C-alpha cells in the first residue's frame, strides 16, 4: 500500500470506531492508560494521544485510534466494508485476542526485543515484518529492522555483494545483509533503517 492509502485506512478505522477527541487533549498532557480499554489511544505504551482529523459539514473533528476493545465490536464484514482487504481478518482476530487476554499487550511492553518478536509472530496475521514494525515503532526497540518491499529493494541495490552472498539462501539473504551491514551500529539498526528509507524515498521524490 502507498503511504496516502495507508493513511486513509487508518483514518477510516478512527472515524468509524474511535472516540471523538477534544483538541485540548491533543494540546495538553495525557496520562498513561490501559492499552486494552482506554481511548483516546496512545500506542502500546499509552503515553500520548493518537488522533486523526475527519472533515465534516461543521469543520474538522478529531477521533482517537480505537482501542482493541472498541475495535472488537466490529464484525468481520464491517471491517471489510472499510476496504481493509485481506487485513480485515487479521485485525478482527487480533482484537479478539487482545480483548480475551490471549494477546497480552501489557506483558508485551515488558519484553526485550527478541522475546517480543517471537511472541508477536505467534499470533495470526503477524509476520516478521509487522512484528519488527511493532517492536521498532510501538515498543521502542531501536535494534529492530523491518524489511518491507522498499527496504528490500534498497538492500539489494545498495548493499548486495554478489560474490559475498552467492551461497546465501534467498530466504535469509536480507536478514544476512542487515546483520552484516547494520549490526555494527550497536543496537540502533532501526534508526539506520529509517534513514535509508527516507533517503531513498526522498531521492526518488516519492515521499508524501
Q: Where are the model-predicted features located?
A:
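HhH-family (HhH-GPD) DNA N-glycosylase catalytic core used in base-excision repair
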Residues: 1-208
Amino acid at each position: 500500500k502507498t503511504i496516502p492509502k495507508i493513511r486513509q485506512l487508518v483514518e477510516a478505522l478512527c472515524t468509524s470506531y474511535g472516540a471523538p477527541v477534544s483538541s485540548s487533549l491533543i494540546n495538553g498532557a495525557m496520562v498513561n492508560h490501559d492499552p486494552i480499554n482506554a481511548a483516546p489511544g496512545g500506542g502500546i505504551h499509552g503515553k500520548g494521544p493518537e488522533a486523526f482529523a475527519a472533515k465534516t459539514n461543521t469543520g474538522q473533528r478529531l477521533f482517537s485510534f480505537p482501542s482493541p476493545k472498541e475495535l472488537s465490536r466490529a464484525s468481520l464484514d464491517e471491517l471489510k466494508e472499510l476496504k481493509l482487504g485481506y487485513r480485515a481478518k487479521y485485525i478482527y482476530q487480533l482484537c479478539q485476542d487482545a480483548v480475551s487476554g490471549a494477546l497480552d499487550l501489557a506483558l508485551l511492553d515488558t519484553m526485550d526485543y527478541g522475546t517480543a518478536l517471537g511472541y508477536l509472530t505467534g499470533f495470526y496475521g503477524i509476520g516478521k515484518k509487522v512484528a519488527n514494525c511493532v517492536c521498532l515503532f510501538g515498543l521502542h526497540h531501536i535494534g529492530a529492522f523491518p524489511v518491507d518491499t522498499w527496504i528490500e529493494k534498497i538492500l539489494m541495490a545498495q548493499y548486495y555483494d554478489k560474490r559475498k552472498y552467492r551461497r546465501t539462501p534467498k530466504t535469509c539473504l536480507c536478514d544476512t545483509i542487515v546483520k552484516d551491514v547494520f549490526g555494527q551500529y550497536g543496537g540502533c539498526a532501526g534508526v539506520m533503517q529509517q534513514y535509508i528509507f527516507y533517503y531513498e524515498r526522498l531521492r526518488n521524490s516519492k515521499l508524501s
